[in-house]
Amino acid sequence: MHLWFTEKQNDNFAISYRVNETLHTETTPFQHLAVLDTVPFGRTLVLDGIVQTSVVDEYVYHEMITHVPLNTHPDPRRVLIVGGGDGGTLREVTKHPSVEKATLVEIDERVIAASKKYLPELACGFDSPKAEVVIGDGIKYVAEHKKTFDLVIVDSTDPIGPAVGLFSLEFYRSIYEALKDEGLFVAQTESPYFNTDLILRIYRDIAGIFPLARTYWACIPTYPGAMWSFTIGSKKHDPAQVAPEKIREHATRYYTPEIHRASFAMPRFLADRFR
């Protein structure tokens, strides 16, 4: 008999993965944490029953949440990552030569520990001399730092449990205050197929605070619907108007200058909702 893990998206839809082995499981002070070795996607991080990342397709998410905003800013030096305890976002941020310091604030240190042990391909980001790790509340940390960062990346779990406040209007206002005059921020904003209303709410909240708001997307097989959105709030620079020659090349597997531009092209079913 085979072992299966099932992630329930709603009452009518679920995704199941055949599992080779349960590598790790624990209940932390904040959430249930598991690392599974799945047949289709290899080692997979699961928090509160929801797949966060896998070693097979993690590069898509981590490249798109980082390189799009980093290549939008003309000279990003200070970067804040809220969440991102697996280390993948930190790994990509530190590839940029202009970045002098990347601070990662993670509320659950057990996520970092498990990632270092079972997901070293991602957690190698913690080894960068540019990296600073703070164990604590990202909302509080942002509120305590005014005009400090060129880029804030909200690499959060879904809007449940400890991550609920990371999707709030008050938090977006706090991020605006934490950014320098040319700063911008990006957040993962869920599935266009299953969370359209949430995406629209987040977009409108951000557009009410920042001069520029843009939503873009990427194909990520392990996420529900395999299509995932990200939303940017920018004080000055438009991520959808970055000239190809301005996009800095890095060792990537998904992100390219062409993908950067194409990611802002909305399918009609989604574009119609933004009108």
Swiss-Prot record:
Annotated binding of spermidine, by residue: 62, 86, 155-158
Record carries keyword Iron: no
Signal peptide: none
Keywords linked to the UniProt accession: Cytoplasm, Polyamine biosynthesis, Spermidine biosynthesis, Transferase
EC number: 2.5.1.16
Sites where the protein binds S-methyl-5'-thioadenosine: 31, 106, 137-138, 162
GO biological process, one term: spermidine biosynthetic process
Pathway: Amine and polyamine biosynthesis; spermidine biosynthesis; spermidine from putrescine: step 1/1
Superkingdom field: Bacteria
GO CC term (a single one): cytosol
InterPro entries on file: PABS, PABS_CS, SAM-dependent_MTases_sf, Spermi_synthase, Spermidine_synt_N, Spermidine_synt_N_sf
Annotated PANTHER family: SPERMIDINE SYNTHASE, SPERMIDINE/SPERMINE SYNTHASE
HAMAP family: Spermidine_synth
Function: Catalyzes the irreversible transfer of a propylamine group from the amino donor S-adenosylmethioninamine (decarboxy-AdoMet) to putrescine (1,4-diaminobutane) to yield spermidine.
Protein name: Polyamine aminopropyltransferase
Organism listed in the record: Desulforudis audaxviator (strain MP104C)
